């Protein structure tokens, strides 16, 4: 993929980005776009405001399919913003435990990533 085209894709809106990622056939390019998406501060703030919706599920599913979680391309903190809504009035106790585990500095990054992978798979399983 040419740099110019990649730049256009990366400068698209969040929903356009998700659509572009879904349409891309090259898994390396898709992983790269997902990794860039979750690292951008602006888009991470957008992700933090998402509710448990089709959009959130699509982001998680894409990340899981592309191995972005296992490879560490998506940080634990970025994934936490997707999995755990800020405005949740009654957070699931399992998700609350994930938050406390994330803030525990004695836990390794590998452990935290595995915890979030499990959490993401759980959400994808229980949500329609």
Swiss-Prot record:
Signal sequence residues: 1-31
Keyword Secreted: yes
Domain of life assignment: Eukaryota
Positions occupied by motif RxLR: 58-61
Compartment annotation: Secreted; Host nucleus; Host cytoplasm
Main subcellular location: secreted
GO cellular component, one term: extracellular region
Alphabetical keyword list: Host cytoplasm, Host nucleus, Secreted, Signal, Virulence
Written domain comment of the UniProt record: Has the canonical translocation RxLR motif, but lacks the canonical EER motif, which characterizes most oomycete effectors identified so far.
Function: Secreted effector that completely suppresses the host cell death induced by cell death-inducing proteins.
Family from the record: Belongs to the RxLR effector family.
Protein name, entry field: Secreted RxLR effector protein 57
Species in which this protein is naturally found: Plasmopara viticola
């Amino acid at each position: 993929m040419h740099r110019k085209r990649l730049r256009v894709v990366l400068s698209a809106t969040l929903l356009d980005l998700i659509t572009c990622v879904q349409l891309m056939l090259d898994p390396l390019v898709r992983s790269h776009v997902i990794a860039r998406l979750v690292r951008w501060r602006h888009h991470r703030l957008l992700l933090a405001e998402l509710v448990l919706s089709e959009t959130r599920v699509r982001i998680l599913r894409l990340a899981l399919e592309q191995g972005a979680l296992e490879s560490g391309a998506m940080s634990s903190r970025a994934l936490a913003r997707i999995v755990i809504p800020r405005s949740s009035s009654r957070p699931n106790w399992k998700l609350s435990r994930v938050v406390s585990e994330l803030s525990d500095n004695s836990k390794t990054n590998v452990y935290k990533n595995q915890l979030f992978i499990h959490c993401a798979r759980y959400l994808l399983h229980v949500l329609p």
